[in-house]
UniProtKB/Swiss-Prot annotation:
GO terms for biological process: translation. Part of the 50S ribosomal subunit. One of its GO terms (cellular component) is cytosolic large ribosomal subunit. This is Large ribosomal subunit protein uL15. One of its GO terms (molecular function) is structural constituent of ribosome. The gene is rplO. Keywords: Ribonucleoprotein, Ribosomal protein, RNA-binding, rRNA-binding. It comes from Teredinibacter turnerae (strain ATCC 39867 / T7901). Binds to the 23S rRNA. Belongs to the universal ribosomal protein uL15 family.
Amino acid sequence: MRLNTLSPAPGRVTSRKRVGRGIGSGLGKTAGRGHKGLKSRSGGTVKPGFEGGQMPLQKRLPKYGFTSRIGRVSAEIRLSELNKVEADVIDLDALLKADLISTNIKRAKIFLSGELKKAVTVKGLAVTKGAKAAIEAAGGKVEE
C-alpha cells in the first residue's frame, strides 16, 4: 500500500444530490422542499426563538436587574501597585500620574494583594481592613 494508491472505503464517498433537474430524478420541480411555506423559499429559515407567531419564551419571561454604571468610574488598586507611585501622599491625582487609573475614574479602593515596600500616606481613597493594616505595618497611614 502506498499513499498514491489509497482510496476511500466503498460507500464512504457519496455524490452530491442534484436537485431541480427534472421529474425523472425524483428531486425535480420543488427540489425536495415541498409546496409553499417559509422553508420552501430561497433564504427561508426560521429565526432562532421564533415559535410560529406565539409569543416567544424570551418575551414571556419577566425582565430583571440592571447594569450598574458605578463600575465605570470606580477602580480597584492592588497594594503592590502603590510601590510604582512616586509621591508620598497617595490620592486620585497621584494614581493618575502613575498611570494606574484612567481619567474617568472618580473613586478607587485599595485592597490587600502583594506587599508595600515603603511608607505612604493614603488620602481620600477607600481601603480594605487588610490593606489598612499592611499600610500601617509598613510605617504609613490612612487618612479619610
